[in-house]
């Protein structure tokens, strides 16, 4: 399994972001407070329905916005799957796999395998295992 792309809308510090991801190792780098961990959080959230930071959905949505959107394209066993997540300030999140709404997080587990590990080789490094 590998993540092919990630799109964010109104997600934390990103009004709009689209990242194409290559199979293998991908490196996120940049100055402090630029959104690297926000990208990792979005990947984890789309794959598990929960934030590894313990954040509430309304905290993830940009200030003065009512909703945020995450789209993640995943390839598994030669098939590409689209995971869409809509976060709304005063409603439950909506999640769909290939356009079909899901009711339980466990429905993602056969498609996405994702874990976050905070191995601090240096104070600012975070590892995301896919």
Predicted regions and their residues:
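Cytosolic catalytic cores of cyclic-nucleotide second-messenger enzymes
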Residues: 130
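Alpha-helical hydrophobic packing sites
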Residues: 12, 126-127
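Nucleotide-state sensing region of NTPase/ATPase domains
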Residues: 47-118
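Pre-Walker A-like glycine/lysine-rich segment at the N-terminus of P-loop NTPase domains
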Residues: 1-45
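Conserved small/polar residues in nucleotide/adenosyl-binding loops
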Residues: 119-126
């Amino acid at each position: 399994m590998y993540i092919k792309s990630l799109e964010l809308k109104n997600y934390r510090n990103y009004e709009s972001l689209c990242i194409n991801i290559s199979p293998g190792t991908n490196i996120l780098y940049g100055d402090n407070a630029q959104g690297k961990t926000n990208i990792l959080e979005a990947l984890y959230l789309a794959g598990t329905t929960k934030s590894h930071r313990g954040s509430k959905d309304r905290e993830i949505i940009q200030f003065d916005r009512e909703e945020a959107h995450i789209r993640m394209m995943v390839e598994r066993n030669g098939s590409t799957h689209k995971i869409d997540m809509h976060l709304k300030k005063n409603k439950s999140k909506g999640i769909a796999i290939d356009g079909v709404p899901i009711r339980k997080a466990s429905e993602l587990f056969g498609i996405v395998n994702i874990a976050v590990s905070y191995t601090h080789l240096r104070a600012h490094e975070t590892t995301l295992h896919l």
